[in-house]
Amino acid sequence: MAELPMIISVDDHIVEPADTWTSRMPAKFKEAAPHIVRKDMPDVTFVGGKLTVNEGGGGAPADWWIYEKLQRPLLRVDSAVGVPRDEVTMKGVTYEDMRPGSYSQKERLEDMDENHIEASLCFPTFPRFCGQTFTEAEDKELALLCVKAYNDYQVEEWCAGTGGRLIPLIIVPLWDAHLAAEEVRRNAERGVRAVCFSEIPAYLGLPSIHDPDNYWDPFFAACDETSTIVNMHIGSSSKMPSTSPDAPAAVGSSLTHINAELSMTDFLLSGLFERFANLKVAYSEGQIGWIPHLLHRMDVVWEDNRGWGGVADKVPNPPSSYFKDHVYGCFFDDPNGLRLIDEIGEDNITYESDYPHSDSTWPRTRQIAEKQMAGLTDEQRYKVVRGNAIRLFGLDFT
């Protein structure tokens, strides 16, 4: 068996530096832009899939993002690499408490070298996984400037000068599909091929992808025309799965793949891939073992319930037939999924390290990948750990 190729991780994260927005805002918006304040941290709970910052002072100092009415502390779970598992909690932290690779380009590249990672696609933290923070904001003029500032930071600072090792991933103003399309095209002109989107936009109070007025068509058309990949991270609907309001966090964490299942069902039964032949979607951190069953079930429903299922007119072919050309799964720990690689398709699977989150396999991503993929051929391993990502995002690697 050949040596494991250098990995391209399509799901990592960046903790934005404190001046990400203040350094890029027009003078009249500098004070209102997201900024960091250091203050004591009260208790934080994560129960029933909901994060709650409890009222009251006390506690150790933490760095807080302040933006409109939002006060959001940096948390240990935002940057958990290098920390013993028992110390990875919901407590607040400062930048000095975090591993520098969480927010600094130089140290991130060094940590990637240590982890056998050649290139990395990073999702945002303060904006949340698809820019929900700005979608929920009251001042939409400022919010649009914040979206553009974040994208400028991604392209001009975070990814700049890395020889393609850090792959730009932008956010868009989801509250206006036409503005979102403009932002996709603005960034495509400077080489960006990846955009964040919500796995289930209806959960955000936005139109669903089944909207009868085709609300999202301008956005999807822009992605289709520019070959921009639509990336959906678990939790990008701001609603994590859980079983009850008092269920412990471990329940929801064990069920995170469900959001990806819901979303993929939505897309494959939407007719979007009929109307946008070049549209491609990628699911981040959803794992892959569930894919064969879901494809089979959708095909059965499509065939047996075509009289009343509501999709016969817009999905003329079995839903599974659209998967190969349009949908990509991603995993960091799914040995069961790898045993189903022939059913899923070796060309539709990508890999991740999830740096610097608590699920991250850093600094042992290579060793874990080698163990998980021991039953794959050299060609399959190449495709999973880098080849499919190169093809999907048009990366300048071999």
Q: Which residues make up each language-model segment?
A:
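Short aromatic-enriched loop/helix-cap "lid" or pocket-rim segments at secondary-structure transitions
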Residues: 19-22, 133-135, 209, 242-245, ...
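Substrate-binding cleft and catalytic face of glycoside hydrolase catalytic domains
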Residues: 121-136, 161-165, 180
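Mid-to-C-terminal alpha-helical segments outside catalytic/metal-binding sites
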Residues: 2-8, 17-91, 95-119, 145, ...
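Surface-exposed, active-site-proximal loop segments in enzymatic domains
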Residues: 87-96, 128-142, 178
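Conserved residues at the C-terminal ends of beta-strands
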Residues: 10, 16, 123, 198
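Short glycine-enriched loops at secondary-structure junctions
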Residues: 123-128, 234-239, 355-358
